């Protein structure tokens, strides 16, 4: 997925980046000189150290999320199980991008005999990235469905969303996404595969949007119905809406961070020879950075929106070698 490979090197997701190669001579020359009308130059270079650093940060943050959910029994609920699945997907996307940078660096510095082996490894990493992307989308959709049930089927929720069903759902998501991700990379040279991936992305977003339109339009009506019941129904419903708002933020960040990459794919198949499309595609590495930033931002959203998760984060950090930071923060 990372495009720091030499010109003319086409492997799996790398072949989806035509901004620096595979273009007609006149367009290539325009890029080489700098496309003055659009302010474009050759493929934007991002230091490999940036990819590796972001990968490490994402790894640490998302491991913290996974450990926190596993450690705190108060977080053993369907929503947090799906968040855990999303954290795994985010971690794999970001770490795989960082690892791929190392692989491509080795590819550029090794002999021709070793390149075929390195390309195979690169294809495996790309399969992980593609599978994790699909798992991220499916996990977000699962959280949306879970929030929908908590609001519209509050009284039957615990009978509908059992731990067993959640486990089966998560397992099915990862099995299907793994198979799909591998197939996408195997047939990545086909435009039909790219169209299919784009279609999956926008279809999932449309499904989530439709759930949210219905959810927020009807939320007040259901809050009024729950309010007449004995107990703390209103409080419970308010917590459910808070979870829905959290997911709205997650989806918004996901769209902002992933949309440029999918727009790149749309340009790749629709106008690969247009100078303006080439201009947009010349920033491919920047779009990869945005994708990795999504994996870093998500854990921060969890922490800001969940007091229980924030509390567990602090407990874990205080028990780690960084525990001295807790003493320092308590003094101020």
From Swiss-Prot:
Transmembrane segments: 44-69, 82-106, 124-145, 166-186, 192-215, 249-271, 281-304
Main location (coarse class): membrane
Entry GO terms, CC: cytoplasm; plasma membrane
Positions bound to Ca(2+): 100, 122, 126
GO biological process: adenylate cyclase-activating G protein-coupled receptor signaling pathway; feeding behavior; insulin secretion; positive regulation of bone resorption; regulation of eating behavior; regulation of metabolic process; response to food; response to insulin
Lipid-anchored residues (S-palmitoyl cysteine): 318
Cytoplasmic face residues: 70-81, 146-165, 216-248, 305-332
CDD domains reported in the protein's UniProt record: 7tmA_MC4R
Extracellular side: 1-43, 107-123, 187-191, 272-280
UniProt KW keywords: Calcium, Cell membrane, Disulfide bond, G-protein coupled receptor, Glycoprotein, Lipoprotein, Membrane, Metal-binding, Palmitate, Receptor, Transducer, Transmembrane, Transmembrane helix
Subunit architecture: Homodimer; disulfide-linked, also forms higher order oligomers. Interacts with GNAS. Interacts with ATRNL1. Interacts with MGRN1; this interaction competes with GNAS-binding and thus inhibits agonist-induced cAMP production. Interacts with MRAP and MRAP2; these associated factors increase ligand-sensitivity and generation of cAMP.
Family per record: Belongs to the G-protein coupled receptor 1 family.
Protein name: Melanocortin receptor 4
